[in-house]
Amino acid sequence: MFAVTVEFTLDLAQRHAFMPLMLENAARSREDEPGCRQFDVCTDATRPDRVFLYELYDDAAAFDAHLAAPHFRAFAAATATMVVGRVLERWERVAP
């Protein structure tokens, strides 16, 4: 399995606009992408400007397909000005 973590730092004034778009992107990823096995969206009340994602895919090609999916491209375009920072890391899962 191929794991991806993403930590977004948001423009705090845009958080309420960002979250519904993020949740829709996560749902569409799980429902529409056969290679997406898990897509968790996490927040921390002590850091309201942060959103953390944990995603599992069958392999790197499935993640590449996610990045090319129309729903992801629409999400990325719609949220571009809401995000002030993003750290994406790719991992190989070795145990559940």
Regions found by a protein language model. Give the residues of each.
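Absolute protein N-terminus
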Residues: 1-2, 96
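Short, flexible helix/strand-to-coil boundary loops that buttress conserved ligand/catalytic motifs
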Residues: 22, 66-67, 76-79
